[in-house]
Amino acid sequence: MVTMEELREMDCSVLKRLMNRDENGGGAGGSGSHGTLGLPSGGKCLLLDCRPFLAHSAGYILGSVNVRCNTIVRRRAKGSVSLEQILPAEEEVRARLRSGLYSAVIVYDERSPRAESLREDSTVSLVVQALRRNAERTDICLLKGGYERFSSEYPEFCSKTKALAAIPPPVPPSATEPLDLGCSSCGTPLHDQGGPVEILPFLYLGSAYHAARRDMLDALGITALLNVSSDCPNHFEGHYQYKCIPVEDNHKADISSWFMEAIEYIDAVKDCRGRVLVHCQAGISRSATICLAYLMMKKRVRLEEAFEFVKQRRSIISPNFSFMGQLLQFESQVLATSCAAEAASPSGPLRERGKTPATPTSQFVFSFPVSVGVHSAPSSLPYLHSPITTSPSC
């Protein structure tokens, strides 16, 4: 057990005062500041969210950094995780921790009331162990009551996913009417109803219709568009930045060869504090595939998590069979790359004698036709019915 002597506790009211002071003082407390809060002593505090990616995405304490501790990480950890495993995309945070630049780290889960109630194999416990090995001079505190209590008492210091406007289902046609799967009772195709959906604060997903609506784009603060098609026009080239990925929505298309270029483009827009709309014709297959690849690469999550995350925001996404297969292969490469980085890290797990870390293929390019059945099951993700399975070396 993680005992009281090993882990200090912090009341929600104390964290609220820190955040309020930091906000009034103009300090770094936003989500773009790597979870850093200013302390009265002049030091800096790091806020770590130890909940799963989907829970963090649904709502989180402002400025917190989400740690990665999914099933794959737990299986490999064997009771001990590295900073590279739990913070794979936060190089600056890892460097600051190792340099002792944080005076304190506050960790929180969903609702743990006290440190003594934590299990040894809980995410918080594993994270605390990693912090104690790599940031020995840093105070570590558990937020009492976790996100559940803090968000209940101080919702103004939390960010929650906006409720999505429900898209009315198509009205079943009568026996005398022709079947039109693409339209609802209002005559507007289902994929064009509503507006683009927010995947991340700087990343939106939509259709060609949305890309042609300048009023929608301006209302969302869109500054760039990623056109994942060979035939959709770029309507406002003098007003927005454009990039085209000429991929057809068929089983022969190699969309994975564009993954890294698309990811770099999205990051470039993000770095300029812009917002990008990724679209194809319907915003269902090609553009959804790019958004899934981005989440997998940058958030270091598996396809299962990324798919569920995007589907919660745009329920009609359905990458074609080949694209799903290429995403599964991309998942293997992302995981293999993470493992190689961990093995090369000074604090990473020791390599077993005679074994070498997995080496990913270059450029994350996979060009092959595959068939992956996509079905809608209420209690499982579509691609889980696929005959394709991946067994990452790590």
Curated annotation (Swiss-Prot):
Record has 4Fe-4S as a keyword: no
GO molecular function, one term: phosphatase activity
Compartments in which it is found: Nucleus
Gene Ontology BP, a term: endoderm formation
Keywords: Acetylation, Hydrolase, Nucleus, Phosphoprotein, Protein phosphatase
Active site, UniProt feature: C280 (phosphocysteine intermediate)
InterPro entries hit by this protein: Dual-sp_phosphatase_cat-dom (IPR000340), MKP (IPR008343), Prot-tyrosine_phosphatase-like (IPR029021), Rhodanese-like_dom (IPR001763), Rhodanese-like_dom_sf (IPR036873), Tyr_Pase_AS (IPR016130), Tyr_Pase_cat (IPR003595), Tyr_Pase_dom (IPR000387)
Segments forming domain Rhodanese: 41-159
Phosphoserine carried by residues: S386, S391
PTM field: Phosphorylation in the C-terminus by ERK1/2 inhibits proteasomal degradation and stabilizes the protein.
Keyword set includes Plastid: no
Modified residue annotations for N-acetylvaline: V2
UniProt-listed Enzyme Commission number(s): 3.1.3.16, 3.1.3.48
This protein's GO CC annotations: cytoplasm; nucleoplasm; nucleus
Domain Tyrosine-protein phosphatase residues, every copy: 195-336
Catalysis performed (reactions): O-phospho-L-tyrosyl-[protein] + H2O = L-tyrosyl-[protein] + phosphate; O-phospho-L-seryl-[protein] + H2O = L-seryl-[protein] + phosphate; O-phospho-L-threonyl-[protein] + H2O = L-threonyl-[protein] + phosphate
Broad class of where this protein is predominantly found: nucleus
Gene3D superfamilies in the cross-refs: Protein tyrosine phosphatase superfamily, Rhodanese-like domain
Family: Belongs to the protein-tyrosine phosphatase family. Non-receptor class dual specificity subfamily.
Reported function: Regulates mitogenic signal transduction by dephosphorylating both Thr and Tyr residues on MAP kinases ERK1 and ERK2.
Record note on quaternary structure: Hollow spherical complex composed of 24 subunits with pseudooctahedral symmetry, has a tetramer as the basic unit.
Name of the featured protein: Dual specificity protein phosphatase 4
Organism (species): Homo sapiens (Human)
Lineage of the species this protein comes from: Eukaryota, Metazoa, Chordata, Craniata, Vertebrata
